[in-house]
Amino acid sequence: MSVEIIAHRGFSSIAPENTLTALLAAIYNQANSIEFDVQITADSVPVVFHDKSLNRITGTPGTIREKTISELKELDAGTWFAESYRGERIPTLEEALAALKSIKGWLYFDIKPHAIWSDLEIKTLLGLIQEANLGDRTILTSFDEDLLWQCRQSDPQIKLGYFVVNASQLPQQISKAEAAGNAILSSQYQVILDQPSIIQETRNKGVDIVVWTVDKIIDFERLVDLGIERIITNCLIGDNVIKNITY
């Protein structure tokens, strides 16, 4: 069995998360797929950024939604991680997709629920994916499931991912993914370790599972032994131990 290694926010253990450097480092270190976060600016430009607040990453107050793209491009998104990354910028989604066009695996978008997206902004997001010819390699996930459904209505072919944070959510989220069709379950990994029978039950309904965020070899091996084939990680990539292990 071959395992799909998915770089969380790019190769975020060696470069500042969600930057072009982190995304490219994941490709260079042979991650199969990449996960990153998407938000929308005040002037309706999709960008790659995780937090609601800009403060942790840039040292600047405010949110992505409150800033224009020109304002965001003035901010340093690298120094918080290491001085050697001074000058890293928050990438636009368009820039990120251009950098990732060579990847042969999946792109997992985590659309953050920090702001309401207009119909036009959703069309902009989907348009960028299609213009990059990455529609058949994209999975959209979000805790805002209304937003997911809006995306599906705009693009009936787009693949969706439904989050699971705790075991009590499993029945409902599996049902949603099954009903949506062309969808996966995106689960916190311990939920699956605690309830491994759910793996086959879910697959019997035509729904695959990706787990997050696995950074210990022991957990990785346990999940693979249970049959999990898609694993999101911050650090278990390339020479960091397991990329070349095939089970």
Mark where each language-model region is.
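Phosphate-group recognition and catalysis centered on beta-loop-alpha active-site segments
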Residues: M1-Y247
